[in-house]
Amino acid sequence: MKSIGLNLSGREYKILIGSDLLSETATLLREAIPCDRVVVITNIDINRIYGKKLKKHLESKGIESLFLELPEGEIHKTLDMAAHIYPQLINHFAERNTPILALGGGVIGDLSGFVAATYQRGVPLIHLPTSLLSQVDSSIGGKVAVNHGGVKNIVGSFYQPRLVIADTGCLKTLPEKEFACGMAEIIKSAAIGSSELFRLLETNTQAVKDRSPEVMEDIVSQTAAIKASIVCQDETDRGIRNILNFGHTLGHALESTSSFSQSHGAAVAIGMCFAARLSVRLGLCENETALRLEKLIADFGLPTNPKDIDPDKIIEAMHHDKKVSDGRIRFILLKRPGEALIAENILKPDVLSVLEEMK
């Protein structure tokens, strides 16, 4: 098991990474929060695979658990779904010290975190991420949010978990599409933060695709450490943390304009290719860098170009991005593998030109 610590203005929590950690949940949980009752928020598919085993494990250690099973998908990450959860917490007599365990991927983590942040002004949150994307990205850093009015993550806050338990054994059961979505975030982290990880992915593509336990624990740990380091420098996303949104400016716009039928990982993959091409157009990086990134993305079965887009609608959606400042869209652009920068005052004709090129 590997442990990564986040120290945020005196508040510290750990990200624990290793195989079969779900079977140690009770012990690891009690080291962070003494408790004998928990609420587990999950979805139908994850509950079917892990719910019974986790419930039995918790009960064997004297921890009573209420499992709340939600429908699957980004479309359900809403205020209405949060409103559906609150009465169940009240009826279960969940108290301010009753932990909420988020068992699932990014949608479950975001929604559970939003509920934990707002129920009784905040209850303990524990992430049990089961998808690759959530293990390396969404469970780390305290962003919690729901979608509203067709805009992704527009209602939310920062609310740090008390603990993250990332069981890499869960990755064995991930469908190929979900695994590829997680790889988009790993490639993103390598592109902005580690030329060594970028090269590792290029030279060990098949071992990663085969989900070798040793390789997966290594790259999950490296990716989580990159994000943890950046979050510790800028918890509330006012500066350097913006670079974690490499690929997300276009990515979120693609998700929103597709009514969330476009998966997050696929959208971010396309967004990274767009950002790299825009970087080349602006003379910020070599064309070879963009080509290496596109090849790596394609090698993991992810798309590199959008389909059936309206560039004007895409730009309109970009103006809802949380990085927008004084009406100006901020883009995260690439200099070379392992180094990115935050750019403002990008001209609309340049953006449109790259979008047209990618159609």
UniProtKB/Swiss-Prot annotation:
<feature type="binding site">
    <location>
        <begin position="106"/>
        <end position="110"/>
    </location>
    <ligand>
        <name>NAD(+)</name>
    </ligand>
</feature>
<keyword id="KW-0862">Zinc</keyword>
<dbReference type="GO" id="GO:0005737">
    <property type="term" value="C:cytoplasm"/>
</dbReference>
<feature type="binding site">
    <location>
        <begin position="72"/>
        <end position="77"/>
    </location>
    <ligand>
        <name>NAD(+)</name>
    </ligand>
</feature>
<dbReference type="InterPro" id="IPR056179">
    <property type="entry name" value="DHQS_C"/>
</dbReference>
<dbReference type="GO" id="GO:0000166">
    <property type="term" value="F:nucleotide binding"/>
</dbReference>
<feature type="binding site">
    <location>
        <position position="264"/>
    </location>
    <ligand>
        <name>Zn(2+)</name>
    </ligand>
</feature>
<comment type="pathway">
    <text>Metabolic intermediate biosynthesis; chorismate biosynthesis; chorismate from D-erythrose 4-phosphate and phosphoenolpyruvate: step 2/7.</text>
</comment>
<keyword id="KW-0456">Lyase</keyword>
<keyword id="KW-0170">Cobalt</keyword>
<keyword id="KW-0963">Cytoplasm</keyword>
<feature type="binding site">
    <location>
        <position position="143"/>
    </location>
    <ligand>
        <name>NAD(+)</name>
    </ligand>
</feature>
<dbReference type="GO" id="GO:0009423">
    <property type="term" value="P:chorismate biosynthetic process"/>
</dbReference>
<dbReference type="GO" id="GO:0008652">
    <property type="term" value="P:amino acid biosynthetic process"/>
</dbReference>
<dbReference type="Pfam" id="PF24621">
    <property type="entry name" value="DHQS_C"/>
</dbReference>
<feature type="binding site">
    <location>
        <begin position="170"/>
        <end position="173"/>
    </location>
    <ligand>
        <name>NAD(+)</name>
    </ligand>
</feature>
<keyword id="KW-0547">Nucleotide-binding</keyword>
<keyword id="KW-0057">Aromatic amino acid biosynthesis</keyword>
<dbReference type="InterPro" id="IPR016037">
    <property type="entry name" value="DHQ_synth_AroB"/>
</dbReference>
<dbReference type="InterPro" id="IPR030960">
    <property type="entry name" value="DHQS/DOIS_N"/>
</dbReference>
<keyword id="KW-0028">Amino-acid biosynthesis</keyword>
<dbReference type="GO" id="GO:0046872">
    <property type="term" value="F:metal ion binding"/>
</dbReference>
<keyword id="KW-0479">Metal-binding</keyword>
<comment type="similarity">
    <text>Belongs to the sugar phosphate cyclases superfamily. Dehydroquinate synthase family.</text>
</comment>
<dbReference type="InterPro" id="IPR050071">
    <property type="entry name" value="Dehydroquinate_synthase"/>
</dbReference>
<feature type="binding site">
    <location>
        <begin position="130"/>
        <end position="131"/>
    </location>
    <ligand>
        <name>NAD(+)</name>
    </ligand>
</feature>
<comment type="function">
    <text>Catalyzes the conversion of 3-deoxy-D-arabino-heptulosonate 7-phosphate (DAHP) to dehydroquinate (DHQ).</text>
</comment>
<dbReference type="GO" id="GO:0009073">
    <property type="term" value="P:aromatic amino acid family biosynthetic process"/>
</dbReference>
<feature type="binding site">
    <location>
        <position position="185"/>
    </location>
    <ligand>
        <name>Zn(2+)</name>
    </ligand>
</feature>
<dbReference type="InterPro" id="IPR030963">
    <property type="entry name" value="DHQ_synth_fam"/>
</dbReference>
<feature type="binding site">
    <location>
        <position position="152"/>
    </location>
    <ligand>
        <name>NAD(+)</name>
    </ligand>
</feature>
<dbReference type="GO" id="GO:0003856">
    <property type="term" value="F:3-dehydroquinate synthase activity"/>
</dbReference>
<protein>
    <recommendedName>
        <fullName>3-dehydroquinate synthase</fullName>
        <ecNumber>4.2.3.4</ecNumber>
    </recommendedName>
</protein>
<dbReference type="Pfam" id="PF01761">
    <property type="entry name" value="DHQ_synthase"/>
</dbReference>
<feature type="binding site">
    <location>
        <position position="248"/>
    </location>
    <ligand>
        <name>Zn(2+)</name>
    </ligand>
</feature>
<keyword id="KW-0520">NAD</keyword>
